[in-house]
Structures are given as structure tokens and as C-alpha cells.
């Protein structure tokens, strides 16, 4: 940044599933200038503003036990602009009460209640309705592969890539089901791996 300049706003712009631009609004500043700024997320023309302390001051919720995970009905995957902005904790407080973060290093979010049609979630990421949740092991991989022969597959914070998980499931790409292999934190316990089958909700 230029000497003597202070950041007043950061614009993170995403379109068509890609982060296109990162724009800084700079103004002249003295040595004692306040460093607070506004973080503006633009996802396909939908705009949401955060202050510079939003992420630091947000405390995400995590699951206490497996029963809590199994009670979830919705999964949210942040869009490219939110991810580029690094707003991984602020998601829980800004996009819907009751959102639970999968794990400290897994940026997927769950809710027991699916959002209404005008929810910000649908504009700032992908919303999925959960149809199946099981612990990830050899038996569940085989069962999921047989149950959902056509599905998109994503691995998040587990010991295999998306392609490796797809090969183990033996599924073909396509259909309306998305299978996530997810590392999930449960309180103070060690993270464990789960399979979640979900169907994406269409944007209104």
C-alpha cells in the first residue's frame, strides 16, 4: 500500500463461481489514523457489508455430539467472495442464527432449519437440503456408493481428495445429489469423518 494511505473499504467481487476482483478504497491518512475499514462482499451483484472486526469478534458454534449433527437439515457452502474475504467465523453470526460450523478448519455450515426463500444464504453461497448422514468408513462408503450411483463429490478436511473419495464411492458424476466427505469437530473430542448426502436448493 502507498505510504500515508489508509484503507477505508475492501471490495471482494465474485461472479459465475469465481472471485473476479479485489478492490481497495484508499484515502490519505496520518500516523494515528484509525485502521477500521468496511469489508464489502459482492457475490453476483448481491452485496453484504462487514466491519473490519467482524471475523475477529465472531465466535462460531460447533457440535457437542453426533446427535446434534444428525439433527441438521441444511448445509451451507460459502461462495467465492465470502471465502476470499476470509469471513469463516462471521458467517455464523451474519447469515443466520443457529448456524453450526463443521470444524475449525472445515468451512461448511449446518442448520436444523432450512432458510426461507429470501435468506441471504442463497445469494452468498450454495444451500443444500440434507438427505443422509453417516460416519465415514469402508462400509458406509460402499453403501453410499450403491445408494447414490450418480453424484457430485467433495472432500473437506479429510485424509483423501475429492477424486480419491469419488473413486472409493464408485459413483458417476451427475444427478442431483452431492456427497460431502467432511471432517467434523465434536466439542473437545478428536475430529471424525462423516459422509453427508445433500440436494442443492435452487436459487429463487
Positions of the model-derived regions?
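SAM-dependent transferase fold signal centered on methyltransferase-like domains
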Residues: 1-204
Amino acid at each position: 500500500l502507498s505510504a500515508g494511505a489508509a484503507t477505508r473499504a475492501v471490495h471482494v467481487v465474485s461472479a459465475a463461481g469465481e472471485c473476479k476482483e479485489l478492490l481497495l478504497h484508499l484515502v490519505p491518512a496520518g500516523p494515528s489514523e484509525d485502521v477500521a475499514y468496511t469489508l464489502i462482499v459482492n457475490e453476483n451483484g448481491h452485496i453484504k457489508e462487514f466491519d473490519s472486526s467482524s471475523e475477529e469478534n465472531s465466535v462460531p458454534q460447533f457440535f457437542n455430539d453426533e446427535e446434534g449433527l444428525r439433527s441438521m437439515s441444511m448445509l451451507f457452502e460459502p461462495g467465492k467472495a465470502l471465502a476470499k474475504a476470509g469471513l469463516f467465523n462471521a458467517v455464523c453470526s451474519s447469515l443466520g442464527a443457529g448456524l453450526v460450523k463443521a470444524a475449525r478448519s472445515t468451512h461448511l455450515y449446518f442448520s436444523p432449519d432450512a432458510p426461507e426463500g429470501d435468506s441471504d444464504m442463497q445469494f452468498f453461497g450454495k444451500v443444500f437440503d440434507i438427505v443422509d448422514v453417516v460416519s465415514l468408513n469402508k462400509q458406509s462408503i460402499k453403501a453410499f456408493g450403491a445408494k447414490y450411483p450418480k453424484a457430485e463429490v467433495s472432500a473437506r478436511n479429510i485424509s483423501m481428495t475429492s477424486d480419491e473419495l469419488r473413486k472409493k464411492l464408485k459413483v458417476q458424476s451427475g444427478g442431483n445429489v452431492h456427497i460431502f466427505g467432511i471432517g467434523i469437530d465434536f466439542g473437545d473430542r478428536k475430529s471424525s469423518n462423516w459422509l453427508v448426502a445433500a440436494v442443492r436448493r435452487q436459487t429463487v
